[in-house]
Amino acid sequence: MSKLKTRSSAAKRFKVTATGKILHKKAGKRHNLSKKSESRKRRLDIPGEIKSVDRWKVERMLPYNL
């Protein structure tokens, strides 16, 4: 059987932790930051965990990271 390819777009966007969680960056931290509060900007720094309904899709795109 041939090797499975990793989706490079998914590899750039998601990070798999040692415990198996799949994390992503939160949207809204690129521009127009002056109108956002400091606490909101800090909250956007914390990575989010993907939803369970989307997990199988990401797992198929990252075959060797899990």
UniProtKB/Swiss-Prot annotation:
GO cellular component: cytosolic large ribosomal subunit
Cited Gene3D superfamilies: 4.10.410.60
One Pfam family cited in the UniProt record for this chain: Ribosomal_L35p
GO terms under biological process: translation
Stretches the record annotates as Disordered: 1-43
Gene name as annotated: rpmI
Family: Belongs to the bacterial ribosomal protein bL35 family.
Keyword Ribosomal protein: yes
Source species: Dictyoglomus turgidum (strain DSM 6724 / Z-1310)
Extent of the signal sequence: none
InterPro entries named among the record's database cross-references: Ribosomal_bL35 (IPR001706), Ribosomal_bL35-like (IPR021137), Ribosomal_bL35_CS (IPR018265), Ribosomal_bL35_sf (IPR037229)
Record-given protein name: Large ribosomal subunit protein bL35
MF-aspect GO terms: structural constituent of ribosome
UniProt KW keywords: Ribonucleoprotein, Ribosomal protein
Positions with biased composition (Basic residues): 1-15, 22-43
